[in-house]
């Protein structure tokens, strides 16, 4: 099993997956990531970065952004795929650099 790390505009986090090395998405593939695949720990870390365009503030009184772009049909394009080995965890990690696909991008 491969650990998957997603990178969107410089923000990286791990997603839960059961992919094997030979089934990891390649450059040019379109992937869908449900927000439920992001652990609570990484979700909390991502919420600390309100300046990222991926997030939208609920309102100014609530001090918490919403990951509005992550839903069941959010498509992302894989721009780059790199591999590394996590010595501490003793497992292979695949880093997928992705960007959101908007209607105007098609």
Locations of regions flagged by a protein language model:
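Residues at beta-strand starts and edge strands
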Residues: 2, 72-74, 90-94
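Short, well-ordered loop/turn sites that connect or cap secondary structure elements
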Residues: 23-29
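Short, basic/aromatic beta-hairpin or loop at an interaction surface
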Residues: 1-13
């Amino acid at each position: 099993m491969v650990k998957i790390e997603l990178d969107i505009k410089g923000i990286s986090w791990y997603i839960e997956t059961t992919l094997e090395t030979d089934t990891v998405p390649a450059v040019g593939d379109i992937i869908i990531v449900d927000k439920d695949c992001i652990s609570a720990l990484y979700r909390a870390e991502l919420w600390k970065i309100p300046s990222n365009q991926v997030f939208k503030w609920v309102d100014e009184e609530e001090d918490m952004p919403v990951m509005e772009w992550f839903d069941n049909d959010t498509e992302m394009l894989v721009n780059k795929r790199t591999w590394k080995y996590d010595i501490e965890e003793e497992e292979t990690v695949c880093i997928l650099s992705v960007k959101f696909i908007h209607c105007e991008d098609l």
